[in-house]
A protein has these predicted regions:
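Hydrophobic alpha-helical segments within soluble ligand-binding/sensing domains
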Residues: 179-204, 249-250, 297-300, 316-333
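Flexible loop/hinge segments that line or gate small-molecule binding clefts
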Residues: 143-144, 148-187, 298-305, 310
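Hinge/cleft segment of the Venus flytrap/periplasmic-binding protein
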Residues: 29-70, 319-376
């Protein structure tokens, strides 16, 4: 019964996030998602744990001095079949850190498309659990994901790492996943919105391209729209749910440009949508329209440096892969109590005005394990 109630509340919360007025209230609207600051107030022991853990993530690896008795088993279910390289880099950096820690492991990887492959993800979860892994790395974006996760929590094993979400669910406070890990969608979107709205002069027409109706899109798109709503001379003229389909984003952009030739901005909720919108802008010679990316992966950085994108929130990507490996190391050392509930990595604003040397510096830091330097 409790599981059904939390599923219903999660569904209501997604609707509320879509209708949110103020971004600071989005995670509290139905008292389901707990923003990081609020969580730290409820759990005063967490700031010290998070600071200590972050120091471990930033520091060089400290290899185990004695080999473990057996390999750890890690099952990964990722919606990685998309243009963004976030998931691929997360996996590569986690594996690189595990090797540096001399922590032997077996890995089973299950990939899918975001939004549309929920049934496949459910089958992948069943297969993964039959393998009896020590760790399951998954995500939470839709109501079906919630059902899958509550099944794992009810089983009591494996240890569950929820990636790409840094706002714990209130319903799970007494039975939390092992770790929430990723980058704060609200924080990153605020960086983008502050820059875009100022460049637009806080006036004009804009459109929104939604990746899906899930949690991530609601956090990103809802935050941008809430910040834009503070300025009465800004008008959202179109809002498209694309189901994660770049072709839908491309066609929606073309249609909006035709119907609103004075369009000033496009807020894109993901890398795939940003690149699709960019294709439409180039084809119509409308590169004057402001366009953002989200995440700052390799494809976005290339588009930004080529003059296509105007701004992005760049994740220091590999930190979240390192964080997962370091959490496993602490468990191996029987120090699980030193693992915080949340790891939220750093995000940097990158714009068309950012000097190339600064972008190179951020790239080396963000991709330090997933994109090793060329020794040639």
């Amino acid at each position: 019964m409790a599981g059904c109630q939390s599923i219903a509340r999660f569904a209501v919360q997604l609707v509320v996030l879509w209708m949110v007025v103020m971004p600071g209230e989005s995670a509290r609207a139905a008292n389901d998602f707990i923003r990081i600051d609020d969580y730290l107030q409820r759990h005063p022991e967490q700031p010290a744990l998070m600071a200590d853990f972050n120091a471990r993530v930033q520091a060089p690896a400290l290899p185990l001095t004695a080999p473990p008795r057996r390999e750890i088993r890690i099952a990964v279910i990722y919606p990685a079949l998309q243009a963004s390289d976030y998931w691929r880099r997360s996996l590569a950096s986690m594996e690189a850190r595990l090797r540096a820690l001399r922590l032997p492991y077996q890995l089973k990887i299950y990939l899918s498309r975001p939004t549309v492959d929920v049934d496949l993800q459910a089958r992948q979860l069943n297969t993964a659990l039959q393998w009896r892994p020590d760790y399951l790395i998954f995500t939470l974006d839709t109501v079906p994901h919630l059902r899958m996760i509550e099944r794992v929590l009810a089983l009591g094993r494996p240890r569950l790492i929820l990636q790409n979400i840094t706002t714990p669910l209130a319903d799970w406070e007494d039975d939390q996943p092992f770790l929430y890990v990723g980058f704060d969608h609200v924080q990153g979107t605020r960086l983008i919105a502050d820059w875009m709205l100022e460049r637009a002069g806080y006036r004009g027409k804009y459109m929104t391209l939604h990746f899906s109706s899930g949690y991530v899109s609601r956090m990103r798109d809802g935050t941008f729209n809430a910040m834009a709503a503070r300025h009465p001379e800004l008008e959202e003229v179109e809002s498209y749910d694309t189901d994660g389909d770049p072709e839908k984003a491309y066609r929606a952009t073309l249609q909006t440009l035709q119907e609103h030739p004075d369009l000033k901005m496009i807020f894109a909720g993901s890398t795939d949508l940003a690149l699709a919108a960019l294709r439409a802008l180039r084809e119509t010679d409308r590169m004057d329209v402001l366009l953002n990316g989200w995440g700052g992966g390799a494809a976005e950085l290339e588009a930004l440096q080529d003059g296509g994108l105007d701004v992005t929130a760049m994740r220091i990507n590999d930190d979240n892969g390192v964080a997962m490996a370091e959490a496993m190391r602490l468990v191996m050392l029987d120090q699980q109590a030193r693992v915080p509930a949340i790891f939220a990595g750093d995000i940097a604003l990158v714009t068309r005005d950012t000097p190339p040397e600064r972008i190179d510096e951020l790239r080396r830091r963000a991709f330090r394990l997933s994109e090793p330097p060329d020794d040639g």
